[in-house]
Amino acid sequence: MPKKRRSRRRPQPIIRWVSLTLTLLALCRPIQTWRCSLSLGNQQWMTAYNQEAKFSISIDQILEAHNQSPFCAKSPRYTLDSVNGYPKIYWPPPQGRRRFGARAMVTYDCEPRCPYVGADRFDCPHWDNASQADQGSFYVNHQILFLHLKQCHGIFTLTWEIWGYDPLITFSLHKIPDPPQPDFPQLNSDWVPSVRSWALLLNQTARAFPDCAICWEPSPPWAPEILVYNKTISSSGPGLALPDAQIFWVNTSSFNTTQGWHHPSQRLLFNVSQGNALLLPPISLVNLSTASSAPPTRVRRSPVAALTLGLALSVGLTGINVAVSALSHQRLTSLIHVLEQDQQRLITAINQTHYNLLNVASVVAQNRRGLDWLYIRLGFQSLCPTINEPCCFLRIQNDSIIRLGDLQPLSQRVSTDWQWPWNWDLGLTAWVRETIHSVLSLFLLALFLLFLAPCLIKCLTSRLLKLLRQAPHFPEISLTPKPDSDYQALLPSAPEIYSHLSPVKPDYINLRPCP
């Protein structure tokens, strides 16, 4: 009797233990996304002179906020080094100049939606449409830029260029959330130096950005080639907010104009083509929710809720596993039934062929006997001696045919159930055995969750909190020029020139407004 061979199907660990992975993922806190928006609105008065004025967003208050903010601890400290109240200001590198003086952004790890680098304001949906002023016209223009940032802990630099002579600037700085915008008083910088306007603007920063800490990022200052002119602009015109050009500029030969830009002085204010030019340092916005310096608070998690969720997922996956196993068992049983039918047909055909072969052998033996009897009656010997040939007989082997009758049914030789590691049968049906196996697997999974899941959850949460508490680190860049650098100090030695910075209100009474 041959030994029965029982096939074993290996368990599928993905189906058995995937509930543990889902449980741990469900217990992890998702990292919240955060977005800040910057809005710059400026209002200017246009006169007969179509001039280009460049304004930017940096002043002494940003130094104070930087030095006092605990979120800028890893950045270098600054001192308010100014002359007659005018602090250090910088100019960013140009990034694609377009018509009307619109300048794009200089971005690092922040991702602004608009304006695009190299695009002018009419190509960007976040710019308000504005028409160029006609000669001799007088009107008020309002521009708003909405700057959407995906990562507010990065660095961004913005240059805002407008047209006009000695413009009246009104700025607002706010987030753009779904709820109503922050309510703070509108700034009014009527005919005051532009630098003081930025001071008023930055005083509102704390209210405008309730979720942001503003840090001033050190960056090498650059000036575009447009500032390198060897000419004189008279100050006897309708009144400039800045002194004459030759006071601030040195000889053109002092600069290497082949590169298109140079290092300006740290305290330099420019008068460009009868326009006002201020310089802009990079500004960084730090998310207060992720850069908080306060000690982390311990949050107690409910292990009962976590285990309940894990057990619920395990029960659901176990039910799926039982259903899949039952369906597989049914299909395997159907296959075995079909194979048994085919096996029975083959055995019947082989037995019939063997029976026919036995009949042929019987007929051959009968013919031999008849021929031998005929030869003997005629006086001869039997057939074989008469024809002088050896006699042959047909012998049929029946051993292999007999073994076919000893075969057990296929359903008794092939197991449709997974018996490992519980190799028992107990006369139970397949459904009962599969259910018992699933319940035992669920019990082992519950024990695993009870002993190891709390430890894993604690490790994951502590790691996430550690990552969230890490404040962004900004590189410390020295603002002091090297001795061998071509850093050009353009300020004159006499500080009395700043007395000319006091603005003069132009006489626009005789000007007629635009129809």
Curated annotation (Swiss-Prot):
Disulfide bonds: 212-215, 212-392, 384-391
Motif CXXC, chain ranges: 212-215
Record-linked InterPro entries: TLV/ENV_coat_polyprotein (IPR018154)
GO biological process terms on file: fusion of virus membrane with host plasma membrane; symbiont entry into host cell; virion attachment to host cell
Glycosylation sites: 129, 203, 230, 251, 256, 271, 287, 351, 398
Spans annotated as Immunosuppression: 365-381
Chain ranges on the Cytoplasmic side, renumbered to this chain: 457-515
Pfam families registered for this protein in UniProt: TLV_coat
Alphabetically ordered keywords of this record: Cleavage on pair of basic residues, Coiled coil, Disulfide bond, Fusion of virus membrane with host cell membrane, Fusion of virus membrane with host membrane, Glycoprotein, Host cell membrane, Host membrane, Host-virus interaction, Lipoprotein, Membrane, Palmitate, Signal, Transmembrane, Transmembrane helix, Viral attachment to host cell, Viral envelope protein, Viral penetration into host cytoplasm, Virion, Virus entry into host cell
Chain residues carrying a lipid of type S-palmitoyl cysteine: 455
Source species of the chain: Bovine leukemia virus (isolate American FLK) (BLV)
Comment on protein domains: The 17 amino acids long immunosuppressive region is present in many retroviral envelope proteins. Synthetic peptides derived from this relatively conserved sequence inhibit immune function in vitro and in vivo.
Chain's gene name: env
Coiled coil (UniProt feature): 330-376, 388-420
PANTHER family: ENDOGENOUS RETROVIRUS GROUP FC1 ENV POLYPROTEIN-RELATED (PTHR10424:SF73), VIRAL ENVELOPE PROTEIN (PTHR10424)
Gene3D superfamilies: 1.10.287.210
Protein name, UniProt field: Envelope glycoprotein
Function description: The surface protein (SU) attaches the virus to the host cell by binding to its receptor. This interaction triggers the refolding of the transmembrane protein (TM) and is thought to activate its fusogenic potential by unmasking its fusion peptide. Fusion occurs at the host cell plasma membrane. The transmembrane protein (TM) acts as a class I viral fusion protein. Under the current model, the protein has at least 3 conformational states: pre-fusion native state, pre-hairpin intermediate state, and post-fusion hairpin state. During viral and target cell membrane fusion, the coiled coil regions (heptad repeats) assume a trimer-of-hairpins structure, positioning the fusion peptide in close proximity to the C-terminal region of the ectodomain. The formation of this structure appears to drive apposition and subsequent fusion of viral and target cell membranes.
